[in-house]
Amino acid sequence: MPSPAIEIKGLKKSYGDVHALDGVDIKINKGEFFGLLGPNGAGKTTTINILTGLVFRDEGSTLVFGRDTVSDYRFTRSKIGIAAQEFSVDWFFPIEKLLFFQAGYYGIRKKDAAPMVEELLTRLGLDKKKNARLRQLSGGMKRRFQLAKALVHDPDIIIL
């Protein structure tokens, strides 16, 4: 039986006296849709940040396709694409260039990324805006750009 896409066991994380996560267990198999719901401060973002290596866990294990998110960071990060709530991009560059930058973060050369960037811009209805800056896009277009950014390295897992 193949490893789950995501497996979290006994995950704990504290920020000082605040226990953001206290023994979280999650198992998501490949092909499943999963919703992580909760009120503000429930630890949703902390869980995602631990999975992607932005935050270190205090205790427990976090695996992506059976590989540890800390000891095998590059592999696990390459398998996840995130369409973040916040826009953490350089607002100066055109969105097409930002997608090439994002691909480059994953070691994808520009010539290899070009077909994917073009396809994403077209499929998400952003091809006519490829030279626009993020600040020039509508709210919906900005969300579609975030999705393109999450997909540009062809990850197996998408976190929205």
What are these regions (language model features)?
Residues 39-43:
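Walker A (P-loop) phosphate-binding loop of ABC-type ATPase nucleotide-binding domains
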Residues 60-71, 75-76:
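Conserved ABC transporter NBD signature motif
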Residues 133-137:
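Conserved ABC ATPase signature
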